[in-house]
């Protein structure tokens, strides 16, 4: 009855006033309406429409393969090259990232691990955020891990300022950090800032999707982490699982600009080729599970609730899919 009422109301109002869901998006006009897109001029709009049609074609051709649903999202009007540059600016230094890693695997003293583990069911994680047109995934991942620790260990629900990390670890502002604002950055550098200075809450230093000069005098309580540790490069699944269970959600760097992950909707993403050169996106692992014999990781992204399943995605576990096991970092309070 409720569905019929909504349908009737939509039929009575002007055409186009009822927004389709992301799965129902079939035209560029629908895409603009759902995601509130406004372009600078006709030339840009034509270019964005071309990219949208390419992504829509890809989604329609791949939907349902291996039981995975793909969907249009906010980034569907970007070219593949633009999207990849948007994530990392093409500026991640893998030599530096590997230098931060532990040299040895964890000592295997953790015994058996549960088949399913999900921090969303054990603590109140903060809302899914949207990094928008700024390549600040590294800041969102680090802040999100710290927020999770405060929820898990102190039962405090706080939303920390990613913008402070973007601005105040910008190496042109403070050369002791290796970050480039919206261009690229490292969650390990963000943790260093949280150790030294701490972060204020989002409401005190709001996010605005651009790099600006740091405001060190912003008022508000500061929240710190006491340390961080990056696991050995290409850690085993068991080491990563144990770390999540013992220390809370972890930051990982992965290949995020491929169309499979970019357009992920529902289902477990499987069998995507990967190499180090494509590492370009930081996200959070909040747990793992198994469904119909397929082992998977639970990923918390920073692309809004329109991506994946309400902002979370599921990627096959057991094959270092998308490089998930390569760069794994946890923090401590």
Curated annotation (Swiss-Prot):
Keyword Transmembrane helix: no
Signal peptide: 1-18
Propeptide residues according to the Swiss-Prot or TrEMBL record: 19-108
Entry EC number(s): 3.4.22.-
GO molecular function, one term: cysteine-type peptidase activity
Enzyme class, UniProt record, top EC level: hydrolase
Disulfide bonds: 134-182, 168-214
Record-annotated active site: 137, 281, 301
Cross-referenced InterPro entries: Papain-like_cys_pep_sf (IPR038765), Pept_asp_AS (IPR025661), Pept_cys_AS (IPR000169), Peptidase_C1A (IPR013128), Peptidase_C1A_C (IPR000668), Peptidase_C1A_papain-like (IPR039417), Prot_inhib_I29 (IPR013201)
GO terms classed as biological process: proteolysis
Pfam families, sorted: Inhibitor_I29, Peptidase_C1
Keywords: Allergen, Disulfide bond, Glycoprotein, Hydrolase, Protease, Signal, Thiol protease, Zymogen
Glycosylation, residue list: 93
Subunit note: Homodimer.
Homology family: Belongs to the peptidase C1 family.
Function according to Swiss-Prot or TrEMBL: Cysteine protease.
Protein name, entry field: Cysteine protease
Organism in which the protein naturally occurs: Blomia tropicalis (Mite)
């Amino acid at each position: 009855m409720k569905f019929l009422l909504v349908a009737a109301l939509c039929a009575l109002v002007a055409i186009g006033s009822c927004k389709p869901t992301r799965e129902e998006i079939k035209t560029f006009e629908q895409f603009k309406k759902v995601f509130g897109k406004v372009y600078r001029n006709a030339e840009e709009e034509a270019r964005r429409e071309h990219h949208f049609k390419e992504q829509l074609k890809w989604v329609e051709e791949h939907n349902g393969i291996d039981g995975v649903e793909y969907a249009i999202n906010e980034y569907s009007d970007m070219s593949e090259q633009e999207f990849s540059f948007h994530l990392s600016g093409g500026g991640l230094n893998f030599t530096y990232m590997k230098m931060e890693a532990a040299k040895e695997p964890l000592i295997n003293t953790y015994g058996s691990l549960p088949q399913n583990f999900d921090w969303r069911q054990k603590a109140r994680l903060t809302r899914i955020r949207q990094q928008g047109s700024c390549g600040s995934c590294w800041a969102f991942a680090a802040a999100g891990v710290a927020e999770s620790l405060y929820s898990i260990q102190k039962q405090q629900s706080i939303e920390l300022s990613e913008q402070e990390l973007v601005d105040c670890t910008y190496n042109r502002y403070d050369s002791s950090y290796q970050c480039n604002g919206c261009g690229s950055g490292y969650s390990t550098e963000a943790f260093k800032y949280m150790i030294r200075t701490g972060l204020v809450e989002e409401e005190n230093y709001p996010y605005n999707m651009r790099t600006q000069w740091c405001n060190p005098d912003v008022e508000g309580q500061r929240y710190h982490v006491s340390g961080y540790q990056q696991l050995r490069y290409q850690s085993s699944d068991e080491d990563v699982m144990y770390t999540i269970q013992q220390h809370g959600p972890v930051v990982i760097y992965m290949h995020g600009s491929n169309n499979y992950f970019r357009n992920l909707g529902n289902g477990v993403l499987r069998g995507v080729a990967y190499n180090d050169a494509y590492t370009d996106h930081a996200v959070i692992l909040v747990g793992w599970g198994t469904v119909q014999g397929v082992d998977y990781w639970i990923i918390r992204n920073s692309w809004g609730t329109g991506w994946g399943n309400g902002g979370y995605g599921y990627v096959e576990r057991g094959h270092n899919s998308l490089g998930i096991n390569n760069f794994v970092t946890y923090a401590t309070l």
